[in-house]
Amino acid sequence: MVNTNNHISEELDKNLDEMEFLKANSDFLRGTIEQSLANPITGSITQDDAKLLKFHGSYMQDDRDLRDERRKQKLEPAYSFMIRVRVPGGKATPEQWIAMDDISNQYANHTIKLTTRQAFQFHGILKRNLKQSMKNINHAVLDSIAACGDVNRNTMCNPNPYQSQVHKEINDYATRISNHLLPRTNAYHEIWLDGEKVLDSSEEKEPIYGNTYLPRKFKIGIAVPPSNDIDVYSQDIGLIAIVEQDELIGFNVTIGGGMGMTHGITETYPQLGRLIGFIPKEKVVDVCEKILTIQRDYGNRENRKNARFKYTVDRLGETWVTEELNRRLGWEIKAPRDFEFEHNGDRLGWIEGINNWNFTLFIQNGRVKDTEDYLLKTALREIAEIHTGDFRLSPNQNLVIANVSPEKKEEIQAIIDKYKLTDGKNYTGLRRNSMACVAFPTCGLAMAESERYLPSLITKIEDLLDESGLKEEEITIRMTGCPNGCARPALAEIAFIGKAPGKYNMYLGGSFKGERLNKIYKENIDENEILESLRPLLLRYSKERLDGEHFGDFVIRDGVIAKVHDGRDFHS
């Protein structure tokens, strides 16, 4: 097997993707970002610096609602920046919540986006405010290092670690993995925090990544059965906690999951992680590093559309990857242990923990904002000002007010009542299990609406559910504005992926447990066609389903859609 890694080579192969040259020549991710930030003539930075900026946790964007008008006025696009804050396991203190709230009000668009990877996200930050925003994030003892880019992204885990000692231990492992796999370059501290500059960066080392980092982004998540809330099979490395007699003994490991694809290119597809074995818990950080280095060394650096670890595993085979992992570890991973998932959603409302309480708040599509009739942002700040526990950002874009002492429970409940905050139980099962990415107006990749549209589409689907007697039925529905898969649509029972404004591909047949990919049902359809397609299916499901049968299972059993056994069959 040929090692295709070039991160230690003095000269790069001319066939490599241009991003490989950019990384290699970036002076360990510095580029000319400082000079771009200092340029007062434009609200943008150079395209090369915009690519490197992702490693620092920020994307350059523009307001796509204003593009045409500004073009007519011969103005440059309305540039702004998104910052994604790294929050391993989604854990934040009340003080950190208040700091994030302040940043959103001072520098962003007065909203906070809770992402599907348990991170904070700010939109609408102007170039002149970017550095101060980064500093303020750092003052809150958070950062945006490696929240984006060709590195390990925010490490996920079950968001309610105070339910038991096991959950707390899981969160600690998520933090250890995240910190261990951070880039070691000093560039972030130099550019954003006025840190002491490295006089000769040629002396700098990236002991894990090398100077070209990974071929593409890399994602790790930890699930605690029976909850698959992190969608463990969507991760490059999935870790499934194995608990015996209330003690965490280790993890089952899956490799090569991923959601993204490109419309029209069948060589790209979503894929489920493959279960390869069991490891003791004390070995988990080393195992994650060794798997990541296999992708570093053998991942495709010539074609970024096929550069994710899922394609490496598919190309080399999971048996070969497992044997190579064993070789690098110097010991063999064991056979996987038994486990079972029940769902991939959140447990909403109050949940009693060990000497404390946790309240999971339903936040539609993760957007924390105040509206005329729902002062969510104000309410959460009031809670943060009195809360003595933690906040936990959920993989389903909800928020856990965690570790609430019995003495504080009544006080927090009073704020919940005052602002009419919801645990989602007044909503349909469909809305409670919905997710959408940001899409328009800020995401440069969006082909169609998502976050701004899904709630109103659900309202219309709810009329069909009412007609079918299914309003309380738990059904997962997800929407993205492009096929990159940020809301993990390929795992949903019903999914919509944007093709053009107002047009979507419709997918059916994912598993309620997050264990099966869905498949395309109809292509390039509008809202009327969506509703016309769903009505007979929901009516039939209502009348013909088996006891306890979920919608995704029904459409496969009924022959509406073929079952997908492997991502390589996704388009067939």
Swiss-Prot record:
Alpha(8)-beta(8). The alpha component is a flavoprotein, the beta component is a hemoprotein. This is Sulfite reductase [NADPH] hemoprotein beta-component. Its cofactor is siroheme; [4Fe-4S] cluster. Its EC number is 1.8.1.2. It is an enzyme of class 1 (oxidoreductase). Pfam families: NIR_SIR (PF01077), NIR_SIR_ferr (PF03460). HAMAP family: CysI. One of its GO terms (cellular component) is sulfite reductase complex (NADPH). Siroheme binds at C486. Component of the sulfite reductase complex that catalyzes the 6-electron reduction of sulfite to sulfide. This is one of several activities required for the biosynthesis of L-cysteine from sulfate. It catalyses: hydrogen sulfide + 3 NADP(+) + 3 H2O = sulfite + 3 NADPH + 4 H(+). Binds 1 siroheme per subunit. Pathway: Sulfur metabolism; hydrogen sulfide biosynthesis; hydrogen sulfide from sulfite (NADPH route): step 1/1. Keywords: 4Fe-4S, Amino-acid biosynthesis, Cysteine biosynthesis, Heme, Iron, Iron-sulfur, Metal-binding, NADP, Oxidoreductase. InterPro entries: CysI, NiRdtase/SiRdtase_haem-b_fer, Nit/Sulf_reduc_fer-like_dom_sf, NO2/SO3_Rdtase_4Fe4S_dom, NO2/SO3_Rdtase_4Fe4S_prot, NO2/SO3_Rdtase_4Fe4S_sf, NO2/SO3_Rdtase_FeS/sirohaem_BS.
